[in-house]
Amino acid sequence: MTKVGLRIDVDTFRGTREGVPRLLETLDKHNIQASFFFSVGPDNMGRHLWRLVKPQFLWKMLRSNAASLYGWDILLAGTAWAGKEIGKANAAIIREAAKHHEIGLHAWDHHAWQTHSGNWDQQTLVNDIARGLRVLEEIIGQPVSCSAVAGWRADQQVVEAKEFFHLRYNSDCRGTMPFRPQLESGKSGTPQIPVTLPTWDEVVGREVKTADFNGWLLNRILRDRGTPVYTIHAEVEGCAYHLDFVDLLKRAAREGITFCPLSELLPATQDALPLGEIVRGHIAGREGWLGCQQCVSLSQ
């Protein structure tokens, strides 16, 4: 039996309003629990359009047929008008998710984090995280125990900022297995559970055809020698490609693959986790930098 952490990122108003209820129904039918990470502030995702001047981002949008994939309401959100606040307008949906699944913070403003957080000082990072956590906790009526930054835009400064919140774990980077990030003080910080597998939009049209993606992904999962973690998006697998996701779940079950919340991948004690740090890096299929797991030698 292969156990895979299932992380569901919710980036937009439409993803929350339409994608999450559909995913909740499907996961319930298949008796699967997952980790949902919600963006709760303004939906300004349309402001990413300026990135079309960057060849890598333009190519990604073209090969994924972004207009059909996301819809024009997402692609234009927050451009000609103020972005709608996601969390409070969809509080009932988020509370419904919290009844059966692990809930964490993705972002206050997904676009702002992905675009600007790499240049923020630590206090700005702390304030932004605190704002998102406060809103999400008000919605679900209980403390939030985990988070996953937007776009995997994280480095050691983000790691340090998140220590203020005493979360159970974070999922801020790409890597191979859970680890303890080493802090400036020399101590180890809140465990990180990296995403190990490519997302749909990173490989479709570049490495694999849409129709072949599920088989390709299942093969990657079965060959994974670390701790497999897979990310889906409410805007993709909860909307335009929902039936493909249903097919993935059915095929995974036949292969002996089970999905679980990310917290179930943590060992009984943190001491069992290796030390590491988050450094800025790049991966194929994704424009710009993102946080990547890097091992830390015990001799350091």
UniProtKB/Swiss-Prot annotation:
Gene3D superfamilies: Glycoside hydrolase/deacetylase. Pathway: Glycolipid biosynthesis; 4-amino-4-deoxy-alpha-L-arabinose undecaprenyl phosphate biosynthesis; 4-amino-4-deoxy-alpha-L-arabinose undecaprenyl phosphate from UDP-4-deoxy-4-formamido-beta-L-arabinose and undecaprenyl phosphate: step 2/2; Bacterial outer membrane biogenesis; lipopolysaccharide biosynthesis. Its EC number is 3.5.1.n3. InterPro entries: ArnD, Glyco_hydro/deAcase_b/a-brl, NODB_dom, Polysacc_deacetylase_ArnD. One of its GO terms (biological process) is lipopolysaccharide biosynthetic process. Pfam families: Polysacc_deac_1 (PF01522). It catalyses: 4-deoxy-4-formamido-alpha-L-arabinopyranosyl di-trans,octa-cis-undecaprenyl phosphate + H2O = 4-amino-4-deoxy-alpha-L-arabinopyranosyl di-trans,octa-cis-undecaprenyl phosphate + formate. It is an enzyme of class 3 (hydrolase). Keywords: Antibiotic resistance, Hydrolase, Lipid A biosynthesis, Lipid biosynthesis, Lipid metabolism, Lipopolysaccharide biosynthesis. GO terms for cellular component: membrane. Residues 2-260 form the NodB homology domain. The keyword ATP-binding does not apply. GO terms for molecular function: hydrolase activity, acting on carbon-nitrogen (but not peptide) bonds, in linear amides. Catalyzes the deformylation of 4-deoxy-4-formamido-L-arabinose-phosphoundecaprenol to 4-amino-4-deoxy-L-arabinose-phosphoundecaprenol. The modified arabinose is attached to lipid A and is required for resistance to polymyxin and cationic antimicrobial peptides. NCBIfam families: PRK15394.1. Belongs to the polysaccharide deacetylase family. ArnD deformylase subfamily. This is Probable 4-deoxy-4-formamido-L-arabinose-phosphoundecaprenol deformylase ArnD.
